Amino acid sequence: MSHHSSWRGHHCAPGDNNCTAGFKESLGSKNYKLLHVPFHGPTHSHHHEPPHPFPTVDVPDHAHYIIGAVILIVGITGVIGNALVIYVFCRSRTLRTAGNMFVVNLAVADFFMSLTQSPVFFAASLHRRWIFGERICELYAFCGALFGICSMMTLTAIAADRCLAITQPLALVGNVSRRKAGAVLAVVWLYSLGWSLPPFFGWSAYVPEGLQTSCSWDYMTFTPSVRAYTILLFIFVFFIPLGIIVSCYVGIFQAIRAMGKEIRELDCGETQKVYERMQNEWKMAKIALLVILLFVISWSPYSVVALTATAGYSHLLTPYMNSVPAVIAKASAIHNPIIYAITHPKYRAAIARYIPVLRTILRVKEKELRSSFSSGSVSSRRPTLSSQCSLGVSIGNAARANGRWGKKRLSSASDSDSCWTESEADGSSVSSLTFGRRVSTEISTDTVILSPGSSNSTASGQKSEKAHKVVSVPVPSITFETDSADESLSDGKALLLGGN
């Protein structure tokens, strides 16, 4: 009711008591009912509308709608893209290896990140406030923390796997199986769960943030408990994993540089092919690095905001500065499938093979499709580097060129089992393959074999001749041939045994 509007033309002279009394009489219950209009101001009567315990932010409506539209696009892309990654890597036999279990796990974490975060965020943005209650807020924030931490730890495991495959390939032969990869992933999930549960037990809390349309852990409250949780969270799930990733790629850079130098020193026609395979390995390692960098870049703005509030400068942060970095962080779930679709040849070929309707969208050529899958069907009995370089190499040089245990890097993981390589099945998944293998010894037909009689010649003459004559002897190598046409062991992971 507006008193001024109902008595807009009534004026009383100063000191006129009769006029004042008449004005008060007009405000009686009868006139109040006749002049009553809906009042939209604050009121103490809430029996017609349920209370809203969560606060709201005074921002334009279009800000909520824009953020809601962006998060909806991110969610749809993340769900569809990561579902395709999971389907293709589980369907394709050449991609179904122990190392690729890390990639599938990353896609699973990103899939559930998009599935649990985007629809709720979008619905809350349409209502311009949090509408789902306290329990759903806690569950929503818990899922975001769990899947975000799991993605970071999985990327760390991928970097470590790449580093070991390139720097210590022989150490992985027979030591990496699906069971061991599954054990690593179990540790990753338990570690992520351990850092996501404390807010349920009073160490920090899960509360609305930013524009009050999403929830996260409480990093705005300046208390010792909240600050301790935030600081330890960033140390153990962001900075330490990031340091491990950087160390792994520094080791990869150094190993590839050393391998290139050693291969160039070998004057043989096959070294160029080995060098090309090494370049392919480096290319796939760079793709992995790109995925990791995009993930770190996506979470960096959110990290800066949280650490700023933890340092005691939360008054400098606006609702936009809290919500926009949260959207960017959740968008990290879409980088993985997009990068695969653009750069990973075997993934592109598998998509075109199992989902033909996407072949035109990804522009997969027939040549690319044939070349990608032909590598999985060829025999693994390829000539080794030692047998190709046998001519003109002395006994001592043959042992050195064949990469005896002191030269592990020459048998690099150019065809290792991770998704980042050109040839997907290798020695690191030896224990996961079937036992129907044929062990063969390959001996070059161009070698000169000393007869038994010649070995009984004068010892001094033979020693003198061996010291000056360049003799090529066969250096047997053990290669494994699988029963499956799609799973083969590359020569880069064969066990090279130098002959005496």
From Swiss-Prot:
It is found in: Cell membrane. Pfam families: 7tm_1. GO terms for molecular function: G protein-coupled receptor activity; photoreceptor activity. Keywords: Cell membrane, Chromophore, Disulfide bond, G-protein coupled receptor, Glycoprotein, Membrane, Photoreceptor protein, Receptor, Retinal protein, Sensory transduction, Transducer, Transmembrane, Transmembrane helix. Gene3D superfamilies: Rhodopsin 7-helix transmembrane proteins (1.20.1070.10). The keyword Disulfide bond applies. Residues 87-101, 160-182, 254-286, 344-500 are cytoplasmic. The keyword Transmembrane applies. Expressed in a subset of retinal horizontal cells as well as in retinal ganglion cells. Belongs to the G-protein coupled receptor 1 family. Opsin subfamily. This is Melanopsin.
